[in-house]
């Protein structure tokens, strides 16, 4: 997943190239690569640092062809792009989710871990079997599943091929100069004319200077941090994870336990959360939403709405509804803050490729974000406090800020959200001493006084471990400001108009889109979130329940499942997810055994 760009020109405009390069960084800065013509030879320079630095090192401004990428690493840490095999190179934005299957059907030998290599191998077979370059897009897109937006360079034939299956590829010109980029905004910035989107059968084949010499390849490697730690199963580590079934008093109507903050039971054993519950999953007529979006529709192929897209089950099902039911032409927006798992990214790729939907990525500096989480978790471990667990996920709140960024870049105002109305977890603030507001209708409240109380109580808790006062504090506070205080306009929730039905959601995603599930849990909820397994382990180990209990309790109150069904589901859903917990701690560079032993030693809120 990356931002790709390129220019063909007799005299490259240095300022325009720098502008394209700078915008491509929005999609990831983990690594970079350039391919350019110098002294009659095509050079490939790849680096494990950001693309602006590489551009400064290489300075390819005297070339007539420059293509490149700024990459959010998803697999193949030791590999980088452009990917080169013999006389063909590719720069690929996207994730191929079935590359192992494709390789098994090719006669070519695989050399790298990176999924993008298979695109070049397919191209080689097409040409060796007597096909033409123009036959390559159809062959690649018919074999590969997942997002593919790429630039292929054929020096021996003097050709550059551009194609995409989801529209994350735009072309334009300035006079005789040709440009391409992953997003239209990149070409708008440099004031290109005749900007067009490439998708499916629309591809572009261009003439470039030919050359029969081999690529001159140079790799720059300075990183010591492992952004994609390899998972290794260690039985002794898995055994450290506790899974007890504590005998806790629970509500006789739902499944909330006596350790839930501010819970009270009446003489029949029914909790105050049940008695004060107001139905949430009662949608308004769908016709109202159709009327609301009518004024936002645009003619032809012009995109008309933004879909904030995490890759979780609710945003994926929401995208399905927007395309199939509302018949809108969306662009999805994903904020990758370093805790989106590969599984989550692959499901994003599945959905966007199958529905033919462009995906704009805003990627944080993953190393920086993970450093912030590590500092806060280290502070938490010195003084464990259930009310402070939210500090570990504060970095993702910039998701809300960048919705406005994408609105400005695309000129699209309407944003449609797929937020599950039953995902309400009062206990996360309850453990800070903030009582539940049973009148709250939204998942997120922007009440100023409520926020003031929350921050005041959190500040007091932070003083118990001064490590919280670190370099991440501004990132935390600014993200929460954008989530809670900024005014939201042209903003609608799909499930205010569609009833949320877990069985239907799962049937559609698993059946129509062959959605991928996690290997360590039967649920489809939170499986693309790298933080969830750890924080739910903490809650369950210390308090005897997790967010699964609150979610299933809401389903009981809504009449979607019975209490007996919920208890059976929770027995599985609350089991520790060793692979995900191990991944989380490895990406943060923390000692698994030390962290888990601290969690296990925290005094329980229930009698053992």
Label for each model-derived stretch:
Residues 77-80, 137, 319-321, 402-405:
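Catalytic micro-motifs at enzyme active sites that drive phosphoryl/nucleotidyl and oxygen chemistry
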Residues 4, 152, 162, 307, ...:
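Structural beta-sheet core signal
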Residues 1-229:
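Conserved short alpha-helical segments that host acidic/polar catalytic motifs at enzyme active sites
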Residues 92, 309, 334-336:
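Short beta-strand/turn micro-motifs composed of small residues
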Residues 95-96, 311-316, 421-423:
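Gly/Ser/Thr-rich loops at beta-strand to alpha-helix junctions
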């Amino acid at each position: 997943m990356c931002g790709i760009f390129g220019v063909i020109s007799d005299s490259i405009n240095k300022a325009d190239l720098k502008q394209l390069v700078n915008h491509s960084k929005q999609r990831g800065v983990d690594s970079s690569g350039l391919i350019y013509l110098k002294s009659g030879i095509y050079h490939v320079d790849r680096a494990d640092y950001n693309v602006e630095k590489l551009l400064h090192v290489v300075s390819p401004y005297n070339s007539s062809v420059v293509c490149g990428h700024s990459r959010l690493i998803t697999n193949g840490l030791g590999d980088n792009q452009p990917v080169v095999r013999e006389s063909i190179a590719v720069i690929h934005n996207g994730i191929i989710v079935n590359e192992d299957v494709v390789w098994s059907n090719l006669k070519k030998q695989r050399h790298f871990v990176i999924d993008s290599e298979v695109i070049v191998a397919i191209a080689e077979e097409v040409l060796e079997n007597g096909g033409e370059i123009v036959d390559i897009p159809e062959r690649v897109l018919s074999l590969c599943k997942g997002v593919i937006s790429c630039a292929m360079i054929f020096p021996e034939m003097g050709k550059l091929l551009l194609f995409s299956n989801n529209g994350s590829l735009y072309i334009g010109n300035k006079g005789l100069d040709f440009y391409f980029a992953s997003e239209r905004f990149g070409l708008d910035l440099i004031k290109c004319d005749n900007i067009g989107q490439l998708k499916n059968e629309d591809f572009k084949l261009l003439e470039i200077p030919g050359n029969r010499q081999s690529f001159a390849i140079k790799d720059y490697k300075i990183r010591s941090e492992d952004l994609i730690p390899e998972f290794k199963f260690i039985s002794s580590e898995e055994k450290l994870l506790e899974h007890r079934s504590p005998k806790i008093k629970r509500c006789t109507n739902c499944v909330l336990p006596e350790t839930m903050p501010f819970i009270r039971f009446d003489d029949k054993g029914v909790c105050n959360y049940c008695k004060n519950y107001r139905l949430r999953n009662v949608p308004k007529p769908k016709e109202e939403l159709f009327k609301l979006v009518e004024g936002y529709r645009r003619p032809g192929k012009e995109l008309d709405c933004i879909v904030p897209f995490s890759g979780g089950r609710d945003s994926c099902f929401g995208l399905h509804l927007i395309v199939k039911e509302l018949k809108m032409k969306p662009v999805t927006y994903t904020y990758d803050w370093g805790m989106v798992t590969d599984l989550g990214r692959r499901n994003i790729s599945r959905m966007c490729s199958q529905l033919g939907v462009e995906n704009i990525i805003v990627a944080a500096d993953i190393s920086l974000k993970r450093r912030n989480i590590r500092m806060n978790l280290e502070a938490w471990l010195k003084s464990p406090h259930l009310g402070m667990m939210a500090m570990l996920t504060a970095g993702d709140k910039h998701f809300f800020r960048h919705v406005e960024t994408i609105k400005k870049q695309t000129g699209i105002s309407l944003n449609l959200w797929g937020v599950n109305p039953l995902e309400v977890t009062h206990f996360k603030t309850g453990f800070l001493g903030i009582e539940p507001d049973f009148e709250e209708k939204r998942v997120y409240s922007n009440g100023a006084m409520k926020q003031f109380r929350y921050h005041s109580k959190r500040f007091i808790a932070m003083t118990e471990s001064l490590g919280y006062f670190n370099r991440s504090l501004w990132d935390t506070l600014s993200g929460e400001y954008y989530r809670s205080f900024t005014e939201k306009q042209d903003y609608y929730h799909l499930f205010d108009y569609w009833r949320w039905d877990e069985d239907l959601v799962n049937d559609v995603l698993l059946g129509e889109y062959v959605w991928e599930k996690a290997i360590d849990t039967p649920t489809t909820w939170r499986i693309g979130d790298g933080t969830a397994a750890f924080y739910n382990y903490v809650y369950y180990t210390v308090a005897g329940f997790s967010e699964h209990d609150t979610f299933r309790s809401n389903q009981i109150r809504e009449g979607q499942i019975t209490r007996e069904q919920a208890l059976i589901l929770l027995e599985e859903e609350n089991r520790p997810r060793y692979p995900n917990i191990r991944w989380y701690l490895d990406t943060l560079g923390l000692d698994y055994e030390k962290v888990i032993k601290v969690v296990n030693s925290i005094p329980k809120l229930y009698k053992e």
